[in-house]
Amino acid sequence: MAWDFETDPDFQTELDWMDEFVRDEVEPLDFVLDDPYDKSDERAMEILRPLQAQVKARGLWACHLGPELGGPGYGQVKLALMNQILGRSGFAPTVFGCQAPDSGNAEILAHFGTQPQKDRYLQPLLDGEISSCYSMTEPHGGADPTLFTTNAVKDGDEWVLNGEKWFSSNARYASFFIVMAVTNPEISAYEGMSMFIVPAETPGVNIIRNVGIGTESEEDASHAYMRYENVRLTDDNLLGEPGSAFGIAQVRLGGGRIHHAMRTIAQLEKAFDMMCERALSRSTRNGPLASLGVVQEQIADSWIEIEQFKLLVMRAAWKIDKYNDYRRVRHDIAAVKVAMPKVYHDVVLRAMHLHGALGVSNEMPFTRMLIGAEVMALADGPTEVHKTTVARQVLRQYKATDDLFPSRHLPKLKAAARDKYAAYFEHELAAI
């Protein structure tokens, strides 16, 4: 029976190295560099390349990929433990070669790409030389593929791509886009959509504008409103078979959702650390904040909620490793997705309140973290949709009763128990 919560000693050594390396070398980058996806920033690359070289020398580069692609092929449990460290810094995933959306794009290129596609797009992505964009969500349809209108129509030997996409991550820095489009409107969206790899320099690829999150300016924004206008592609640009986009997307998004949750744990622990430090450092008339019952309650609630969420994430990661089939853990991943923004929001809000006016200022990270919590409630599908997924998957394990009363109706259970053990109660029955 394998059921323990201990980390293999050899891997714990690697985690300890990561923890120190990220704390001392990587976290400071968040305060001196602009964007980890901007490969044209020569100063940033001058700093990042030596750090990436250290990670590669340690054998910790692109750990989500197998040895055939230059990674160690870590399972989701190891990735979860690793991402709980990397999530502390916006630059850490880039330093370790596992940054979204590039990591997810690399996975589907590895699974579904042709060899020429892997040579042109995957290898430079794995080497950290370029950035990529996953262009799926639409202004009207959101993340629901049944409402997508972006389409690609066959014209001789070419495909002509037209449509608009919304919130396309890192479009401004991307060397190529992976675009989901309707190719057969006569059948179900689940079978009538295809994925295309679109080089950024292709005529007709236009960024309408960059879209900031919260108070981000358009100049600093990391997402884009895209328009694809008569973009001409060939079959060489197809990722996978025509009509296979939905299946490809599920492979990509399943892993992406759990990885977001893993990194969120790091942010939760950062907020909790700040909360506890503040409680011990700040005093009122009656002593430190930590001596107040209401503050102790907030600290206890936060610690419990973080540990509950961490266990939910780790269990989902363990099941992914065990079954190697995202369909079998669909409701586990959806449950993680639902729990993530709430615990993130609640813990950060408590930490913010303990810091008073300082907490809502731009001298502390809480407002950015709160916005991050709301982003997590929408990224890769809104919370409400994932709640529906959880409920539907769970209800499949049950069936309705044909009786008038519930199956756990106490009089019925009592009568059945009496029948089962009647021989032991004959004297009582005789006396009645």
Question: Where on the chain are the PLM-derived regions?
Answer:
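Flexible, glycine-rich active-site loops centered on histidine and acidic residues
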Residues: 106-112, 134-135, 186
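Flexible, small-/acidic-enriched active-site or ligand-binding loops
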Residues: 147, 203-232
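Long, acidic (Asp/Glu-rich), low-complexity accessory segments flanking structured domains
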Residues: 229-247
